Amino acid sequence: DKQILDDLQNEVKRVCTSSRNWTEWSGTMEQWITDIAGWDKDDSSTIVEAGSILPTQMFESVSTNIQSLCKQINASYEHNLYDCTAVIMRRLLEGLLVLAYQNHDIESEITEKSGWHFTLDKIIKNAAQNKKLALSANTKRDMPLFKDIGNFSAHKIWYNSTKQDIEPHILKYRVIIEELMYKAGVK
């Protein structure tokens, strides 16, 4: 409580000394009151994003779990959290591939005897040659890139993903994900 009061006192002093007139000071005070009145209404579960990698219209009609991953990809990229972006991009790629296999009734082709799915590397290799999935040439070619970026961000101790690692490949990713959404039957 003491820290809150000290912070408030310092902030009030700053506003008083920096305000040039009564209108400016009272405007700041009114904004504080509005902010404080809404504290109990804060929505901490809504993901705020602007569609920087995956446009909202691309995923607004799919299941909520896929929507959440798409929103997390956009929001993490927009907030410069590039390792997060890379890992979630990989996760969405893998999830949609598995759903595509399920949608085509060929999930057994990527499932071990134990019931676990193959590694993403093996799934991508199978998908690239799989006649039932019939993926486009660019999707076959570009999927390994996003597996690698996601793996580097998740597992390489000395690697940090940067905007330059992701930005040049946004269109490729968008094309892959949209194709997989259709192949998975979620769109």
Residue ranges of model-derived segments:
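Internal, Lys/Arg-enriched amphipathic helical interaction segments that engage polyanionic partners
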Residues: 1-61, 178-182
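Solvent-exposed, amphipathic alpha-helical segments
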Residues: 65-76, 149-156
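Generic alpha-helical secondary structure signal
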Residues: 64-68, 119-122, 141, 145-149
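Short, charged amphipathic alpha-helical segments flanked by flexible coils
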Residues: 101-139
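Amphipathic alpha-helical interaction surfaces
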Residues: 11-14, 18, 95-103, 126-130, ...
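Inter-repeat boundary and helix-capping residues of tandem alpha-helical solenoids
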Residues: 62-63, 82
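Charge-enriched, short contiguous segments at helix-coil
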Residues: 19-30, 134-187
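Short, hydrophobic, well-ordered secondary-structure elements
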Residues: 70-102
